[in-house]
Amino acid sequence: MNKERKHIVFLARWYPHRYDPMFGLFVQRHAEAAALFNDITVVYSQQTTDNGQQTLSTDNQQTVRTYCIRPFEIVRTLENNVDTIRIYYKKPKNKILSLLRFYRANMIGLRLGRKDGRGEPRPYDLIHVHILTRLGVIAWIQKLLHKTPYIITEHWSRYLPGNDFGGFIRKLATKIVVRNAKLVTTVTDNLAKAMQNHGLKNDNYVVLPNVVNLDMFHISKKNTDATSHVPTIIHVSCFEDKSKNISGLLESLKIVEQKGIDFQCTLIGEGMDFDLMKTKAEELQLINKVSFTGLLEGQKLADELASGDFLVLSSNYENMPVVILEALASGLPVVSTNVGGIKEMIDETKGILVEPRNKEALAEAIIKMIETHNDYDPDYLRKSVIEKYGYESVGKFLDSIYNK
């Protein structure tokens, strides 16, 4: 006899939208994994600076309804079996009005999600909050008013040392929200401990794996003849230099080049510091050694990863970058700074870790990987991801959490 599917609503602070199809992609993947075993509705609100009405174009998307409740534009779609409600609204200049509009937008989304696309009642069994604190307050209020339990998944690295988690009201609200949650999940044990160090207490902290599309990311056979093959380094990030430290990576690559070692580095992504990093590469005279692809998604990203020899990340702080899992699924070893929860995934059989903010150490690790990347077993690297991070595995894990 089949188990009855629960109706779970994701209240997401980060989620792909019309202006940024990569924003919070890992939350969308969790929703898709959860939808294998339960009925999932996603509610997401996004401030805008324009009046245009356009829809996010994705594969496997069916528009159910698009309409306006001033000043909100609501776009409801069915995406990979996930009922997705995006609420867009123009950004007010007043901060208090902006906060009130944010809460109203999410309350509208919650109300709409209680009915399916045909208008049939569909109450929530559980609220799944992704990223604190504001959405956690909404979930807490819903628990008080409707007795609907909620759980939390935190992805944000703001609790880690050196990051900004402050303010009396914010901390107090976060403590209340976390204490009253049925369960708290994080994508690394490191983040869970950091949250608890801030006094965010809950009896049930659980590590929730990220999701990798194992059908998309694949191992590619390469011509690695030592006499002709130029090692290809891959870097993927959102090009925000404060955290991702792309400038430090470029400086390390310059050290490698000055030692007379041949390589090519492909930098994938876009973001606020994209143009600045291109200028930095020009200043370092690395234009013949590095290339900037801009944003790559889906199969294009998977194919570019598979064409490389290894992945390099140079972050100053991180949580658990999904791109590491995608690289391993593609059979690529990893060179990374030892920050956040990365050491929970990368050991000496999968790559090399170095201390952050040390360009000489990163350069030495890159040189070592250029010399030894063929010693890593691509099948072993991929297998390390398959059993834990596939859609079905994570979907079953979420289902077990929802039924606790």
Regions found by a protein language model. Name each.
Residues P333-S336:
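Short hydrophobic beta-strand element within catalytic cores of glycosyltransferases
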Residues M1-P71:
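N-terminal subdomain of nucleotide-sugar transferases
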Residues N190, V211:
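Carbohydrate-associated surface elements
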Residues Y15-R18, Y150-G167, N180-L183:
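A short, histidine- and acid-enriched strand-loop-helix "catalytic/donor-clamping" loop
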Residues E348, I352-K359, K368-N374:
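Conserved acidic donor-binding segment of nucleotide-sugar-dependent glycosyltransferases
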Residues D273-L276, I287-E297, E304:
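Active-site donor-binding acidic/aromatic loop of nucleotide-activated sugar
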Residues N316:
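Aromatic "clamp/platform" in nucleotide-sugar-dependent glycosyltransferases that forms part
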Residues V9, A226-K244, L250-K254:
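Conserved donor-binding/catalytic core segment of Leloir-type glycosyltransferases
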